[in-house]
From Swiss-Prot:
This is Maturase K. One of its GO terms (cellular component) is chloroplast. It comes from Gossypium barbadense. GO terms for molecular function: RNA binding. It is found in: Plastid, Chloroplast. Keywords: Chloroplast, mRNA processing, Plastid, RNA-binding, tRNA processing.
Length: 504
């Protein structure tokens, strides 16, 4: 954000709305390239043009765009575009990378003003992402129903452009965005989130996709506040849009004028909402009547206000006592633990059946084995196989790699209620390591283990750093120590360390 302020020197009151001239500045592409090297490589593969990035190509691109008589595209010949010539794909992607930086400038300037002491909108429910873990432990077991709605797609390209026009008031920039989208997608009018990320700049498309989903979520949060009379998380700069304020005002009038008598049907003081992996997840403590009303609300909102076709079958309602929610790499559900209490009054005794709701988090072992199979640690049945691509490394490096993966998975899934599934994962990694070493030394697994013994694999069984700290706090024979090892332990860094969680 400081780099934007130094390079751009924009007047926040006027000039930040006119972003089109920035596409002709070389430092924009330099900033985008530096950002990609530092951050985006964590999540996305190289698209094939990163090694071709140079200042010479940027200058050539700017010169081509600056020639006004060549800014007419031919729809009949998308591969030989007069603007970009034979380097159509390369130049289109470079423009997308630069434009992704440009459209974020208004938000970056607002964040800079906040960091310099400007007043930030207050919220009584502004929480960190790490509040997920207390929510799972303290509140999840009290919920009854969960609603999972697949966010409808394909999304028309024009809808993405229209969603951005209320943030960027520069018409030239919007025309450039529209031109780039249609040009790079080969004039195909529809895209899906997964397809767009694979063929277009990930940073730009994630920005456009999140801005689009934020539109209907803002209206949902408004109605949710009106129905439950609870404050929700402030969205800050993402709610500064005149068009959708008009929609919210209209919906508010309809809500109060037409449905005031039935307001009690929507009241739910215990409702939670989150968007995760292309799904809108709504959980509630109330009855099935209320959750079904929210189901048809989602369908109608997408169809009549955002022109996205959605069917009620894409919205599923499940009871948490009979269904496991796939969230953050865990299968979370509410388990009923039956218990019998004997009560005696004078000479009469009674047996009282009592069921206690508890949180049950399980490891999706089938999906995890599928991820290990894709990574070539085992076959589809879970049988360990060797890793031939690592066979050229030293023995110590091979063992360190396998041990690191095993510890990361154990660290991530330490919040599981039953850790027996982790033993199978460790078994797969341990014997995959042995088979890789045996393949390197051109020996069988049995002969290799007989020759060196199993001591060299004891690192798979040594305690982690966190377990060592816990053992220092509680003695090994202490009762609380045994309870800690059997119970769930949530580590705050698991949000970003495990790449195998995204099984899809």
């Amino acid at each position: 954000m400081e780099e934007f302020q130094v390079y751009l020197e924009l007047n926040r009151s006027r000039r930040h709305d006119f972003l089109y001239p920035l596409i002709f500045r070389e430092y924009i592409y330099a900033l985008a390239h530096e950002h990609g090297l530092n951050k985006s490589m964590i999540f996305f593969e190289n698209q094939g043009y990163g090694n071709k990035f140079s200042s010479l190509i940027v200058k050539r691109l700017i010169l081509r765009m600056d020639q006004q008589n060549r800014l007419i595209s031919s729809a009949n010949d998308s591969n030989q575009n007069p603007v970009f010539g034979h380097n159509n794909n390369l130049y289109s992607q470079m423009i997308a990378v630069g434009f992704a930086v440009i459209v974020e400038i208004p938000f970056s300037l607002r964040l800079i003003s906040y960091s310099q002491g400007a007043e930030v909108a207050k919220s009584h429910n502004l929480q960190s992402i790490h509040s997920i873990f207390p929510f799972l432990e303290d509140k999840f077991s009290h919920l009854n129903y969960v609603l999972e709605a697949l966010i409808p797609h394909p999304i028309h390209l024009e809808i993405l452009v229209q969603a951005l026009r209320y943030w960027v008031k520069d018409a030239s920039s919007l025309h450039l965005l529209r031109f780039s989208l249609y040009e790079y997608c080969n004039l195909k009018s529809f895209i899906t989130p997964k397809k767009s990320i694979s063929i277009f700049n990930p940073r730009l498309f994630l920005f456009l996709y999140n801005s689009h989903t934020c539109e209907y979520e803002s209206i949902f949060l408004f109605l949710r506040n009106q129905s439950s009379h609870l404050r929700s998380t402030s969205s800050g700069v993402f709610l500064e849009r005149i068009f959708f304020y008009g929609k919210i005002k209209y919906l508010g009038e309809v809500f109060y004028n037409d449905f005031q008598n039935n307001l009690w049907l929507f009241k739910d003081p215990f409702i939670h909402f989150i968007r995760y992996q292309g799904k809108s997840i709504l959980s509630s403590k109330d009855t099935s009547l209320l959750i079904n009303k929210w189901k048809y609300y989602f369908v109608d909102l997408w169809q009549y206000y955002f022109y996205l076709w959605s069917q009620s079958g894409r919205v599923r309602i499940n009871q948490l006592s009979k269904y496991s929610l796939d969230f953050l790499g865990y299968l979370s559900s509410v388990r009923l633990n039956p218990s019998v209490v004997r009560s005696q009054v004078l000479e009469n005794s009674f047996l009282i059946d009592n069921a206690v709701k508890t949180l049950d988090t399980r490891i999706p072992i089938i999906s995890l084995i599928g991820s290990l199979s894709k990574a070539k640690f085992c076959n589809t049945l879970g049988h360990p196989i060797s890793k031939p691509t690592w066979a050229d490394s030293p023995d110590s490096d091979i063992i360190d790699r396998f041990v690191r993966i095993s510890r990361n998975l154990s660290h991530y899934h330490s919040g599981s209620s039953k850790k027996k599934s982790l033993y199978r994962i460790k078994y797969i990694l341990r014997f995959s390591c042995v088979k890789t070493l045996a393949r390197k030394h051109k020996s069988t697994v049995r002969a290799f283990l007989k020759k060196l013994g199993s001591e060299f694999l004891e690192e798979f069984f040594t305690e982690t750093e966190e377990e060592h700290v816990i053992s220092l706090i509680f003695p090994r024979g202490f009762f609380a120590m045994r309870k800690v090892y059997r119970g769930r332990i949530w580590y705050l860094d698991i949000i970003c360390i495990n790449a195998l969680v995204n099984h899809s």
